[in-house]
């Protein structure tokens, strides 16, 4: 193997103008790989309001990002053609590379399969998607299952972030060479600074999606905490919380201060974790959340439901 490889990160999820935080954990993984190897990121996403495909390229020494924005379409064949054309255009810009690092097996795995068959370039898969768990199995279409099996079979390695995710993928008959590779943490950013808060502070950080993250369950727990604590603050970071206003009103908090903070830049998250007495995750299903590892790195204790890869 070459001492230094040129790795193509083929990403169905990646931060962009359309979704600035989508797949930010993949970006951090790519930057971790870039510590040892050259990395090029390829991402394609539909962007409302444009009339034709546009390409944006960001080059920074050995870490280059290539994003194509395509005109949206409800016609699946038109959408497929636009994605394929954008993919071909980006490949020309990127040039020669040694290996493909596919993030999320489907649908971008079809591109990885194409590169293996036409250019003999091997690929590995990093998988993060909770959709493989049995609770979400109904969301997988037959064509996705069929093609995913083909992609998984041809991968040199399949790297789920937890053993639990591996088991869920195997239950979906996605066989292959499995190697568990957890999510990454920037320990130069997430570190303990021994900051304390006068008021007992609890923090939760997520997408705040109710079926997944169980925000309503945490709010009910917060109400019960009023029987134990004279005062406390519970920060929910990741959304405005509008959908929980009725529940919060009905719970009628007297001692607890509930804050919903819509967006916090990743670089500022350590300050919230360091100012917290505890981090809480109440999910109904999970893989291996980055934020738990980041909390540990800051020295902040974690309370979590015992689900998935946690």
For each feature predicted by the language model, list its residue ranges.
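Carbohydrate-associated surface elements
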Residues: 164, 184
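Conserved donor-binding/catalytic core segment of Leloir-type glycosyltransferases
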Residues: 8, 195-213, 219-223, 235
């Amino acid at each position: 193997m070459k001492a230094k490889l040129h790795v193509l990160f083929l990403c169905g999820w990646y931060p962009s103008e359309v979704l600035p935080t989508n797949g930010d954990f993949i970006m951090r993984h790519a930057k971790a790989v870039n510590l040892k190897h050259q990395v090029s990121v390829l991402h394609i996403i539909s962007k409302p309001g444009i009339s034709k495909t546009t390409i944006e390229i960001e080059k920074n020494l050995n870490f280059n990002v290539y994003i194509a924005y395509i005109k949206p379409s409800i016609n699946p064949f038109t959408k497929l053609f636009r994605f394929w054309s954008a993919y071909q255009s980006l490949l020309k810009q990127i040039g020669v590379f040694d290996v493909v690092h596919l993030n999320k097996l489907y649908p971008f795995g079809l591109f990885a399969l194409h590169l293996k068959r036409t250019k003999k370039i091997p690929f590995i898969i990093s998988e993060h998607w909770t959709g493989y768990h049995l609770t979400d199995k109904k969301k997988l279409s037959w064509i996705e299952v069929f093609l995913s099996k083909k992609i998984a079979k041809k991968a040199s390695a399949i790297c789920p972030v937890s053993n639990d995710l591996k088991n869920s993928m195997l239950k979906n008959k996605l066989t292959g060479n499995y190697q568990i590779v957890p999510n990454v943490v920037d320990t130069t950013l997430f570190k303990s600074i021994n900051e304390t808060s006068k008021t007992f502070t609890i923090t939760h950080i997520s997408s705040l999606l109710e079926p997944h993250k169980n925000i309503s369950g945490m709010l009910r727990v917060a109400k019960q905490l009023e029987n134990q604590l004279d005062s406390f603050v519970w920060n929910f970071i990741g959304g405005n919380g509008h959908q929980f206003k009725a529940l919060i009103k009905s719970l009628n908090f007297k001692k607890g201060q509930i804050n919903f903070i819509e967006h916090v830049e990743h670089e500022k998250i350590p300050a919230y974790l360091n100012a917290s007495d505890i981090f809480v995750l109440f999910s109904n299903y999970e893989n291996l959340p980055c934020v738990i590892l980041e909390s540990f790195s800051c020295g902040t204790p974690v309370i979590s439901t015992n689900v998935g890869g946690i």
